Amino acid sequence: MTFGHCRRASTLRSAFVLGLCGLLLAGCSGADDDRDAAALKDKYVTVNLGVRGPVDLPADGVGNLQTFSPQQIYAGKKLFESNCQNCHVGGTTTPNPKVSLALAKLQGATPPRDNIQSLVQYMRLPMSYDGSEETFNCRKSDWIEDDEAQNLAAFILRASQKARGWGTARLEANQDSMTTAPP
């Protein structure tokens, strides 16, 4: 085998590897495009929550904000539907205590649960509404990754701010179902 032949084979191998990497990257970006499209087609997210672009939500109790994309809010909605909706349909709470996820109720908790940090903390270690004792937790503290917990908290906060009837008995006033699939 001559030196030129080895060099050509090496160049072909490099081109193949680069081409394969390009295909993989293109495939990955396609998945993101699908998530982007799903988030922007979801009526509950775009209409009821008013999310058509990035939204700022309270990050902590001192006024810092955290920006969430429509895709993150949509991911939080999907997590809510698959993990929380049985007990918290439409932001209500069906088992005891019957304290809903309405914004006023989140703000009235001790400590307030009206920001991303406090909701994630509550998901990890639930406390009674008055903050005096640990409450029943249906999941282990590590049941969800931090970024997923933040997306879930973002969905809950945005719904408590914008969704008509969220956390109230007037859920029938909501025009679009929580579980309506995107068209």
From Swiss-Prot:
Iron keyword on record: yes
Topology class, membrane: Peripheral membrane protein
Pfam name, any one: Cytochrom_C550
This protein's record includes keyword Iron: yes
GO molecular function: electron transfer activity; heme binding; iron ion binding
Signal peptide: 1-31
Cofactor note: Binds 1 heme c group covalently per subunit.
Keywords of this entry: Cell inner membrane, Cell membrane, Electron transport, Heme, Iron, Membrane, Metal-binding, Photosynthesis, Photosystem II, Signal, Transport
GO BP, one annotated term: photosynthesis
Cofactor(s) for this UniProt protein: heme c
Residues annotated to bind heme c: 84, 87-88, 138
Subcellular location: Cell inner membrane
Any single GO CC term annotated in Swiss-Prot or TrEMBL for this entry: photosystem II
Main location: membrane
Purpose of the protein: Probably one of the extrinsic, lumenal subunits of photosystem II (PSII). PSII is a light-driven water plastoquinone oxidoreductase, using light energy to abstract electrons from H(2)O, generating a proton gradient subsequently used for ATP formation. The extrinsic proteins stabilize the structure of photosystem II oxygen-evolving complex (OEC), the ion environment of oxygen evolution and protect the OEC against heat-induced inactivation. Low-potential cytochrome c that plays a role in the OEC of PSII.
Record text on subunit structure and interactions: PSII is composed of 1 copy each of membrane proteins PsbA, PsbB, PsbC, PsbD, PsbE, PsbF, PsbH, PsbI, PsbJ, PsbK, PsbL, PsbM, PsbT, PsbX, Psb30/Ycf12, peripheral proteins PsbO, CyanoQ (PsbQ), PsbU, PsbV and a large number of cofactors. It forms dimeric complexes.
UniProt similarity note: Belongs to the cytochrome c family. PsbV subfamily.
NCBIfam families xref list: PS_II_psbV2
Name of this protein: Photosystem II extrinsic protein V
